[in-house]
Amino acid sequence: MGKIQELSPELINQIAAGEVIESAHSVVKELMENSMDAGATQMDIESKDGGLSLLRITDNGSGIDPEDIEPALKRHATSKIRDYGDLENVLSYGFRGEALASIASVSRLTLESGIKNQKTAWKICSIGGKISEKEEIPGFVGTKILVEELFFNTPVRRKFLKSVRSEDKKIRDRVTTQALARHDVRFRLFQDGKEVFVLPSRENKKDRIVDLFGENFRDHLLEVSLERGGLNATGYISDPDFYKSNRTGQFVFVNGRPVEIKYGSTLLKKAYDELLPPNGHPYCFLFFEIDPSRVDVNVHPAKKEIRFLDEEGFNGFFLTLIQKELRSSTPVSFLELKKRLLRPTPETFKTSSLYQAHSSSRSGESPLLSRELFTEVPRQEGFDLDRMGPGASLSALTDNVVKHSSFVPKKHFGVLFETFILAEAEDGFCIIDQHTAHERIRYEEVLRKLEKKNYGIQPLLTPIRIDVSKQEQEDILNRKKEYEEVGIFLDPLGEDSVVLREIPAYMEPGEEKEIILDFLNRTEGKETTEPELYDLMAKCVACRSAIKKGDHLSDPILAEILNRLSYCENPSRCPHGRPTLVKLSRDDLERMFHRK
């Protein structure tokens, strides 16, 4: 017998499932899309144990004809296309005929479906893709699909899945995306028997956005629309005061299909230009309509990516759509708007969404100040040592820390360009970045306090309210105990806010809101161990509380920074990996001046 043999249909389906079905959220996506293609106006989604134990999708769509029940579970069997011409003009969500067969091949699946004017419906069961049961049941209109023990026959796949909480979030994100695509459909989501959300059908997209993300979004959305050259676009973008420090608030749909645009995020940043800080990313909910023959949706197994016939033309259209509204939404020029946005006083700070951040968390510069505006900031005449840690004593900082032999400062000579400390070390000359050096000091100080749980809790005179979406609030409350491990105590306030009443003593009053927002953003959707939480919090505190470029430092403070830096475990890098100092040995200097 030859070595090359044809694979069994079951194995072929399992291999195909590996491309289409990443985890439970992929099953939810495929089944919701089938429901949409069937004309459903109501949909219930249920999951248990992150969808691995159970997934159930129920819709009121047109149902499946009795003679099509069995073929529906076969690979490459579909009612949506017949020839290549149909594929070129496809508008349905699904068209390959892979989803049900792939899902059935890696689960125990039960499919029930009925059509109009029929007294009976049909039920079919399969185990690992093999039909085990088929029977008539009382009639109804629509489809119910039950998926149990996902990946029961592919245990390796189960090993690579994340925690139940992580899988639950992915399912919520999938339903959220589909609910944005179809505001006219009622969605209900239940996880482990608990109602996550009920979204009534809406007459417009904005109401659906508010349903999902919170009432605080309503006043920060700018409506966009443009029609040109066979392209039509509608939707909403956030005003420049309302943004996230990651891209998870950006949703793009083409012909109703949620997709990832190759340069979408880059185009958005370009459209907003300098209206946002470097780490700011706007929200967007954009809906494009285009002749299906001008777009290829068949380039990705999960249909996440698409290809445009005229990509350059689409990118130009995308950019114009955003810039047109940004220009018309304000009476001031872009330059004036930039200066207004990038130079607020502390009193103008406002946080309208959980992940809105009002400073460049990694830029090393003062909040919302661009490089060219730095010289206009009033210079501090001195710097408070308390921001660097408790007292002048180094005992708390140096406990159990071996002094790093590669950086032993002798004396400093001053500061160059209001940023770089010039100092003589034991074996040469050093240039130290005052911001990154203080970041390293603060990072190790806070990390040590967290690891030893050696910090107190101080009440706030005025509690801080943080506006969030309903889902964000639930995510925070689900992680309440984790956050309390780093001294963050957040309680619900209504349906779309949380309140902070006390802070850990390693934070300085006045900086706590931005630190906590940054911390929540960095932990969003991530599984984190206790040491990882400590590391993230220490980085957030260090980044926000460290002295900045341009801060005027007295001689005693300069000496204290150098002394404390020398006791750090890793004095040569800030927590984000940037260098804190550059050193030239005496030999280096003598070679530069040809003395050697």
UniProtKB/Swiss-Prot annotation:
One of its GO terms (cellular component) is mismatch repair complex. CDD domains: HATPase_MutL-MLH-PMS-like, MutL_Trans. Keywords: DNA damage, DNA repair. It holds the Pfam family MutL_C. Belongs to the DNA mismatch repair MutL/HexB family. PANTHER family: DNA MISMATCH REPAIR PROTEIN MLH, PMS, MUTL, DNA MISMATCH REPAIR PROTEIN MLH1. This is DNA mismatch repair protein MutL. It comes from Leptospira borgpetersenii serovar Hardjo-bovis (strain JB197).
